[in-house]
């Protein structure tokens, strides 16, 4: 009887998950399921972006294997996959950068070889529970882009968000920096239009100022950066971002970062297990001689 109930539960989850994620999060940039090899340029860095780090248990692995949900396939890695990726980067002499260092080298015009900047969007509980311990173990710096108006919220687009207490614990390690992912403009409309892209100038400026104030008060935020919800931004809205006082913006795109990358369209590579295998491991920057 217990086995039968378990199967029914799993099947129900598999039916519900592809539907529920359509309303909530990251369908906008999950169209390409076949990562291609990254073009390599000397003097470049990799910005590796994560969203979910799943617990590697039987149920999660079962759901991952059988689900057709792009939210699960493209926007998450398991805890074991994440640790394997970190260990692979370390074994290939990656130079792990803080956000401050990353921006410094970009502005200076010269990245150290094999530069890697680890960052996370949304900051839900899976990051605290499954990624944070690994980064702490290996002493790897990271940046979290926080939806500041939903810190500690349960069931935000089917996600439980990290609490302020947990964020402060992470910050005190000296390994974490926190930046804005908006205060309350992270949503998709029914036609997959970003709430940020639809908002008025006054609404955007008010929202970003509120987010900046929260981050400055709690985490001494100083880098003036934003990770755009869903990685989406266009030239029509960009003047508003600048008017709000932000100096750098991060998108989602399968490209390495160079000093010449536009400061408001800095590409980050969305990491799944497939993306790491096909893009990161094959990047020529890890295979060139010093």
From Swiss-Prot:
<dbReference type="GO" id="GO:0005975">
    <property type="term" value="P:carbohydrate metabolic process"/>
</dbReference>
<dbReference type="InterPro" id="IPR011330">
    <property type="entry name" value="Glyco_hydro/deAcase_b/a-brl"/>
</dbReference>
<keyword id="KW-0964">Secreted</keyword>
<feature type="domain" description="NodB homology">
    <location>
        <begin position="114"/>
        <end position="290"/>
    </location>
</feature>
<feature type="signal peptide">
    <location>
        <begin position="1"/>
        <end position="28"/>
    </location>
</feature>
<dbReference type="GO" id="GO:0016811">
    <property type="term" value="F:hydrolase activity, acting on carbon-nitrogen (but not peptide) bonds, in linear amides"/>
</dbReference>
<comment type="similarity">
    <text>Belongs to the polysaccharide deacetylase family.</text>
</comment>
<protein>
    <recommendedName>
        <fullName>Poly-beta-1,6-N-acetyl-D-glucosamine N-deacetylase</fullName>
        <ecNumber>3.5.1.-</ecNumber>
    </recommendedName>
</protein>
<dbReference type="InterPro" id="IPR002509">
    <property type="entry name" value="NODB_dom"/>
</dbReference>
<dbReference type="InterPro" id="IPR051398">
    <property type="entry name" value="Polysacch_Deacetylase"/>
</dbReference>
<dbReference type="Pfam" id="PF01522">
    <property type="entry name" value="Polysacc_deac_1"/>
</dbReference>
<keyword id="KW-0732">Signal</keyword>
<dbReference type="GO" id="GO:0005576">
    <property type="term" value="C:extracellular region"/>
</dbReference>
<comment type="function">
    <text>Catalyzes the N-deacetylation of poly-beta-1,6-N-acetyl-D-glucosamine (PNAG, also referred to as PIA), a biofilm adhesin polysaccharide. N-deacetylation is crucial for attachment of the polysaccharide to the bacterial cell surface; it leads to the introduction of positive charges in the otherwise neutral PIA polymer, allowing electrostatic interactions.</text>
</comment>
<keyword id="KW-0134">Cell wall</keyword>
<dbReference type="GO" id="GO:0016787">
    <property type="term" value="F:hydrolase activity"/>
</dbReference>
<dbReference type="InterPro" id="IPR023872">
    <property type="entry name" value="PNAG_deacetylase"/>
</dbReference>
<keyword id="KW-0378">Hydrolase</keyword>
């Amino acid at each position: 009887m217990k086995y039968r109930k378990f199967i029914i539960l799993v099947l129900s989850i598999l039916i519900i998950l592809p539907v529920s994620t359509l309303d909530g999060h990251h369908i906008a940039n999950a169209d390409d399921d076949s990562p291609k090899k990254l073009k390599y340029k000397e003097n470049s860095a990799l910005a590796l972006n994560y969203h979910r780090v799943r617990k590697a248990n039987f149920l999660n692995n079962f759901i991952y294997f059988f689900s057709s949900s792009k939210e699960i396939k493209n926007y998450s890695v398991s805890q074991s996959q994440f640790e394997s990726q970190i260990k692979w980067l370390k074994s290939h002499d990656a130079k792990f950068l803080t956000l401050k260092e990353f921006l410094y080298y970009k502005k200076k015009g010269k990245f150290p070889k094999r530069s890697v900047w680890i960052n996370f969007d949304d900051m839900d509980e899976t990051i605290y529970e499954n990624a944070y311990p690994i980064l702490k173990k290996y002493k790897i710096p990271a940046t979290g882009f926080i939806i500041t108006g939903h810190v500690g919220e349960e069931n935000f687009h089917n996600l439980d968000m990290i609490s302020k207490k947990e964020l402060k614990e992470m910050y005190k390690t000296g390994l974490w920096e926190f930046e804005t992912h908006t205060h309350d403009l992270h949503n998709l409309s029914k036609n997959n239009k970003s709430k940020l892209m639809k908002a008025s100038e006054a609404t955007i400026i008010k929202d970003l100022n509120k987010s900046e104030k929260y981050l400055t008060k709690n985490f001494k935020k100083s880098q003036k950066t934003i990770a755009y919800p869903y990685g989406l931004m266009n030239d029509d809205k960009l003047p508003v971002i600048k008017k709000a006082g932000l100096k750098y913006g991060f998108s989602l795109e399968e490209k390495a970062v160079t000093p010449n990358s536009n400061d408001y369209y800095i590409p980050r590579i969305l990491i799944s297990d497939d993306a790491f295998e096909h893009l990161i491991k094959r990047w020529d920057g890890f295979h060139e001689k010093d």
